[in-house]
Design a protein with these regions (language model features):
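AMP-binding/adenylate-forming
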Residues: 2-12, 21-81
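Beta-strand-connecting loops/turns
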Residues: 19-20, 175
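Active-site glycine/GP-rich loop and adjacent strand/helix microenvironment
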Residues: 45, 52-234
Length: 234
């Protein structure tokens, strides 16, 4: 119930309604908990769901053509694969039924809310497609999702408590970098108390133009103690 409610709120945040048809371009198998959450949340909202799975651009476009999917749940770099396939095969993708994508797994924006290089490439090709960025982790069992104003992912305060801590474990000020630290609410199997995610972000507390008053999160600036692996050596 908690997982489905989390994604129900996320779909509402991006403006989905029961008139939308979600195309899941990600697996719900192989222990990918979020995939099941997307499906359950969409059904709770009343959306139709096409469970296509990841990869296979030809199958994705066939499904969009047949079912008229309006929203995609997708890794943003795969959108470029969809565009490349469409261009090679004469598909008029800019006039397809797909109007928005909720992007997972990869950064889409810079910390100041502008599209990053990948986001710009997608928008240059497909300007009518709305791209919504998200931030989530398995540990928090919740997500931060952008609204239509694209100025940070909104906290879902009934599901987690979030803090942003500096190197001395003091609260980071609004607009300053801080480590995302979360306390889960309503989790029974493995509840977490002030769990440090290792992700460094900015946060913003002023009310959003969408009318929500919840804390908003920037894209991830980096990882605390980030390491680069080179030829098997840390």
């Amino acid at each position: 119930d908690r997982l489905s409610y989390n994604e129900y709120l996320s779909f509402e945040t991006v403006g989905c309604t029961k008139q939308d048809i979600l195309q899941l371009m990600t697996t719900i198998d192989r222990r990918f908990m979020a995939g099941l959450a997307y499906f359950l949340g969409a059904r709770e909202l009343g959306m139709g769901v096409a469970r296509v799975g990841n990869g296979i651009p030809e199958l994705q476009w066939d499904t969009i053509s047949r079912i008229h999917s309006t929203c995609g749940m997708v890794v943003p770099s795969f959108i470029m694969k969809l565009i490349e396939f469409a261009e090679k095969n004469g598909i008029d993708y800019t006039n397809s039924s797909l109007k928005k994508c909720i992007c997972i797994g990869e950064a889409l924006r810079t910390p100041d809310f502008h599209l990053n290089t990948l986001g710009k490439k997608i928008q240059e090709k497909w300007s009518s497609l709305k791209l919504f960025s998200t931030y989530a982790s398995t540990e928090m069992q919740s997500s931060f999702t952008e609204c239509e104003y694209f100025c940070g992912g909104h906290l879902q305060p009934e599901l987690i408590i979030v803090e942003f801590l500096d190197d001395d474990n003091n609260p980071a000020k609004e607009g300053e970098a801080g480590e995302v630290t979360i306390t889960t609410l309503g989790v029974e199997g493995m509840p977490l108390l002030r769990f440090k995610t290792g992700d460094i972000c900015y946060h913003f507390d002023e009310p959003c133009k969408c009318g929500r008053n919840t804390t908003r999160l920037s894209s991830v600036l980096g990882r605390k103690g980030q390491m680069i692996k080179y030829k098997g050596t840390t």
